[in-house]
Curated annotation (Swiss-Prot):
<feature type="binding site">
    <location>
        <position position="92"/>
    </location>
    <ligand>
        <name>Zn(2+)</name>
    </ligand>
</feature>
<keyword id="KW-0862">Zinc</keyword>
<comment type="function">
    <text>Part of ribonuclease P, a protein complex that generates mature tRNA molecules by cleaving their 5'-ends.</text>
</comment>
<keyword id="KW-0378">Hydrolase</keyword>
<dbReference type="GO" id="GO:0001682">
    <property type="term" value="P:tRNA 5'-leader removal"/>
</dbReference>
<protein>
    <recommendedName>
        <fullName>Ribonuclease P protein component 4</fullName>
        <ecNumber>3.1.26.5</ecNumber>
    </recommendedName>
</protein>
<keyword id="KW-0819">tRNA processing</keyword>
<feature type="binding site">
    <location>
        <position position="66"/>
    </location>
    <ligand>
        <name>Zn(2+)</name>
    </ligand>
</feature>
<dbReference type="InterPro" id="IPR016432">
    <property type="entry name" value="RNP4"/>
</dbReference>
<comment type="similarity">
    <text>Belongs to the eukaryotic/archaeal RNase P protein component 4 family.</text>
</comment>
<keyword id="KW-0479">Metal-binding</keyword>
<feature type="binding site">
    <location>
        <position position="63"/>
    </location>
    <ligand>
        <name>Zn(2+)</name>
    </ligand>
</feature>
<dbReference type="GO" id="GO:0005737">
    <property type="term" value="C:cytoplasm"/>
</dbReference>
<keyword id="KW-0540">Nuclease</keyword>
<feature type="binding site">
    <location>
        <position position="89"/>
    </location>
    <ligand>
        <name>Zn(2+)</name>
    </ligand>
</feature>
<dbReference type="GO" id="GO:0008270">
    <property type="term" value="F:zinc ion binding"/>
</dbReference>
<dbReference type="InterPro" id="IPR007175">
    <property type="entry name" value="Rpr2/Snm1/Rpp21"/>
</dbReference>
Length: 105
């Protein structure tokens, strides 16, 4: 019984920490992109350690191949093509495609 409350409490704390790290990544990016990439790396590791998913809006802020924090216009190109938003990471060239239009059911 105590393990389940401890586990849920640590997961809640991990979610908060991940949100703080992504906020810090956005804050650090103009001065130090390497530091913001490190924040993304730490957030991913916390999520894996506690087996929690990173929320969709946060997940779309970094490249899935090189784990670079993405800022449109700076190190990411954003285009709309055939009903999808295509985000290209300018560090590694990886393209992420996200559907636009109908909401998910």
């Amino acid at each position: 019984m105590a393990d389940t409350t401890r586990k849920s409490g640590s997961r809640r704390l991990a979610r908060e920490r991940i949100a703080v790290l992504f906020a810090r990544a956005a804050e650090f990016y103009p001065e130090s992109p390497d530091r913001s990439n490190r924040c993304v790396e730490l957030a991913r590791k916390i999520g894996m350690r506690h087996r929690i998913r990173i929320e969709r809006p946060l997940k779309r802020r970094f490249c899935r191949r090189c784990y670079t924090y993405l800022v449109p216009g700076s190190n990411a190109r954003v285009r709309v093509h055939r009903g999808r938003v295509v985000v290209t990471c300018l560090a590694c060239g990886h393209r992420s495609r996200f559907p636009v239009g109908r909401p998910r059911q």
